[in-house]
């Protein structure tokens, strides 16, 4: 399973209209791209842990998009609904990080740590 991980901070002064347009683009992508296996969106919780002060960026939101495999992720990245979402996302954010991770459950930890990495087979995107 692959997890497309997006950490971000909205642009200061982002209008309600721009927020709604971003949300509409997200809903369109989630409902229109069958390659998406799962999705979660969350807001950062600050609770006084020491590591909070060491973060260089205060990225308020995290989105996690789950895919079965690399081919599914590539389908998502190339889909017109993702292109629209990506365009709106880039215009709406002040800062962000986007990473893709190969995920395993606890019964497969050794396999991930010892096994080969998923190798990219062309193309990039968010």
List the predicted regions and their residue ranges.
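Active-site-flanking beta-strand signature of metal-NTP-handling nucleotidyl enzymes
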Residues: 2-10
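Short coil/turn motifs at secondary-structure junctions
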Residues: 11-13, 44, 68-70
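Generic detector of contiguous secondary-structure segments
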Residues: 16-31, 105
């Amino acid at each position: 399973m692959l997890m497309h991980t997006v950490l971000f901070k909205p642009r200061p002064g982002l209008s309600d209209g721009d927020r709604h347009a971003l949300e509409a683009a997200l809903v369109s992508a989630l409902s229109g791209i069958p390659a998406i296996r799962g999705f979660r969106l969350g807001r950062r919780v600050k609770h006084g842990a020491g590591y909070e002060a060491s973060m260089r960026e205060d990225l308020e939101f995290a989105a996690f998009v789950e895919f079965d495999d690399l081919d599914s992720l590539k389908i998502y990245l190339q889909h017109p609904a993702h292109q629209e979402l990506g365009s709106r996302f880039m215009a709406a954010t002040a800062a962000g990080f986007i990473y893709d991770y190969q995920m395993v459950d606890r019964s497969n930890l050794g396999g991930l740590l010892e096994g080969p990495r998923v190798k990219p087979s062309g193309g990039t995107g968010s």
